[in-house]
């Protein structure tokens, strides 16, 4: 460790003929591994927070449409409450994802612009809401949509912005709150971007 805070320095020491040196390559790999591990743990917790937020949204019916449906988007349309987050005035109750968005803002997220056509990243991961489930999900295959409202359930996929750099595993969760993970490999972004349903077959493993 180094410094007053005993920060665990990632580069191991190597003994050479002329003395001890730091193994820079091993240090770089350890830094990446630590970042991946941290991002993946944060992502699991974020997914569980989204599940709680969706349940709160459905219970409260903030858009006053008369249905206890789930939100189809994370950020509400301007002037509406059709997503899990919307701006609030002083003294107003937070939106379901208000605390999470506030924490992200404190960390500097949301100050820049997201890549064109892609969801904004948070701790190295992007998130998408899914509106259906496949035959491998409990209850079999069906759409969560009823007359364009997300009534039958919801699901979310979270995938790394850069596979093997910002994360390795892709994660999915639905309204039951069980998070599954799978390594989709180098084609992670394409596979996750094209995912249309929550379908945890035997290749997906539940997160313990």
State the predicted function of each range.
Residues 57-165:
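Flexible, glycine-rich surface segments
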Residues 152-208:
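C-terminal soluble interaction/assembly domains
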Residues 1-12, 154-158:
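Exposed beta-strand-loop-beta-strand "reactive/processing" segments of non-cytosolic proteins
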Residues 2, 16, 174:
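Acidic surface patches and DE-rich sequence motifs
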Residues 28-77:
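Conserved hydrophobic/amphipathic alpha-helical signal-anchor segments
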Residues 6-37, 178-182:
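Short beta-strand edge/turn micro-motifs at domain boundaries
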Residues 5-7, 27-30, 132-135, 161-164, ...:
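Solvent-exposed loop/turn segments at secondary-structure junctions
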Residues 5-9, 43-46, 53, 164-167:
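Stable alpha-helical elements in mature extracytoplasmic
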